[in-house]
Amino acid sequence: MTTPVQSYLEDLHARLAQDDSGTVADYIPELALADPSSFGIALATVDSAIYEVGDTRLPFTIQSISKPLTFALALESRGEMVRERVGVEPTGEAFNAIALDPLNPLVNAGAILTRSLLGPDPDGSLLRGYSAFAGRDLLIDDRIRESESRTAYRNRAISHLLRGAGRFAGEPDEIVEDYIVQCSVLVDCRDLAVIAATLAAGGRNPVTGRRVASPDTVRDVLSVMATAGMYDAAGDWLYDVGLPAKSGVAGGVIAVVPGQLGIGVFSPPLDDQGNSVRGVRVCEELSHSLDLHMFKHAHRGPSPVRRTFTLAELTSKRQRDPAVAAQIAREGARARAFELQGDLGFAEAEQVTRAVLETPAEFVVLDLRRVRNIHESAIALLAGLADRISALSAAPRELARVMSAQPFDELDRALEFLEDRLTGDTAAPALVRLADHPVLRGISADDLALLEGLLEHRFFAAGDYLLRAGEAVGELLLITSGVVSETVELASGDVRRVATLTAGMTIGELALLTGGPRIGDARADTEVECHALPADALAGLHELDAHLRAILLRNLLEIVAARSARTRQDLTTLVD
C-alpha cells in the first residue's frame, strides 16, 4: 500500500520534474556528462523510516556536501583546534573565492584548511567516517577525482595562499589532492537522506543505530550549515526555508530538520549560486507545505502516540452479554485504538500513519482529545488513511471533514462502535423470561414465584432518568430490555460515561448494599423495561425466605465484584 508520505513525494516529484531550468556544472569536465533530467528525492526519519521517489539510487559525487562531514570528523578528532583555526562566519562570496581568511568550513578556503587538520589518510579513515554517516560502505569515483584534479587551479591557488600565510603545515598540492578525494566520494540520493537524518538525530545513524558524532559536534555543524551551507544564498535560504542545508555542484542537496528527519535531493542542473534548482525547490516546498521551518518549533515533543491498545486489552464502558464479551476477548486484537497527543505536524503525522499502516488490526480508532494543535500537513497525511480508520474521537472539524470515519465526542463511544463492528452486536436483546436474569440465577421455581410477587414493573422512555446522582437508593432495578447509560459529572462540568447497561444487568446494587446515595445518573438511551425490587422487600426476605435472600445477595456481590474489577482495569490503564 502506498503511504500518504509516499503519495505526497510522488506528486511533488512529478510536478518539479517539469522544471528544466538551470545548467549542469561543466568546470569539471566529467560533471558535464550528467543527465539533466535525473531527479530523485529521499526522506529519512530519525526513527529509520525512508521514503524515496525518482532516481534515488543513481550514484553521483558528493562534492561540497562532504564539507560538513569533514568538519564533523575534524571536530571529533581535533576538538577546539578546529574552531581556533577555521571561522564560522558567512562570506557573501562565491564558494571557490580565492581568500586568505577561511571564514567558515563550507567554502573552499575553510574546507581545505579543515581537511589539512586531519592530516594524511593512508588507511582511508575519512572514507570510513563518511560511510558511517551514510550507513553503508562508500567508494571513490576515480574518473571524477582525476578530472577535478586536472582543473583544480583555483583550489591550488587557495591552498598555496593559506600555506604561504602559515595557516597549515605540509605540501599545499597534497592537501588539495586530499580535498579532491573527499569531493569524489560516490553517494546516491538515499545516502544523502540518511546522512541528513544522522545529523537530525544528533549524530546517531537511524539505520545502523551507530553513533558517529557527538551531539555537541552536530550542533556546531548544523549551526554553520544554517548560516553558510547554501553559498551566497544562505541568508535568503535561512529566512525562507529555515533548515540547515548543504549543496554540491554535482546536483546534490541535503537539508536537516533537527530531531525529525533528513532530506536528500539529486538533480544536476544548477542555479546562478551553484545550487540544484530542483533541490532548492523541493526543500522550499517541503518546508512551506509541511511546516518544517526550524524556528517555528522550539523543540520536538514526546511521541505523538501516547498509548495504543486493542479491544482485547481494554473495552468500552458498555457491559455486554457474556457470550458477546467472550467474543470481544477472543477477537479484540482485530480492533486497535491510538491515543494521540501534543502538536501534530508533518513529522508527528508521519509517525502516526506508519504506526497505523503497520498494525494488522481491521478496525482502527484515532483519539485526538489530547492533541493541542494539528497542522494542515498533518491533516493531509492523516486523510490518506481514510480507508484504514473506522472511527475518530474528539477530532477537530477540519480533520473529520476529510475522513470517512465515524466521529465521536469521546473515546469510549468510539470503542463501543468498534465492538459493534467486531461482533455485530448492535441491538439490545430483550430477555424472554425474568428467570433468565443473572440476579435470579440459582433460585427455584417456587422462589421465583415468590419473588415475582414482590417485583414492580417499570417502563422508561428514551431520555428518562431512572436514578439521579445524590438520591437515596430504595430499590434494585433489573433491566429486561433497552439500554441505560450511567454517567458522572466531573469537576470540570463535563459528563463522563462510566457504564452502559443492557438487558440482564442491574442498576443500584452498590448503593443498595452499602446504603449510600447514588454518585451518578442513570438515564435511558432507548425505551427501557425493568423490574424493581424494593429495599424493604429484600430486607423482609430475611424472615420470609432466608435462603432466597442469601442467593440474591450472593449474585449481587458477584455483580459488584465484576464491576469493581472493571473499575480497577480503567484505573490501571489511565482511562479518564
For each predicted feature, which ranges?
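Cyclic nucleotide-binding regulatory module and flanking cytosolic helices
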Residues: 5-6, 416-465, 502, 512, ...
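Amphipathic alpha-helical interaction surfaces in cytosolic regulatory modules
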Residues: 342-406
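Glycine- and acidic-residue-biased ligand/ion/polar-headgroup-sensing regions
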Residues: 67, 463, 472-491, 502-506
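Structured C-terminal helix/loop/strand segments within mature extracytoplasmic catalytic/sensor domains
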Residues: 202-233, 238-311, 332
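Active-site SXXK
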Residues: 48, 61-83, 195, 263
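Cyclic-nucleotide recognition modules
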Residues: 263, 497-554
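Active-site-adjacent helix/loop patches that line small-molecule binding or acyl-intermediate pockets
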Residues: 1-21, 76-182, 190, 198
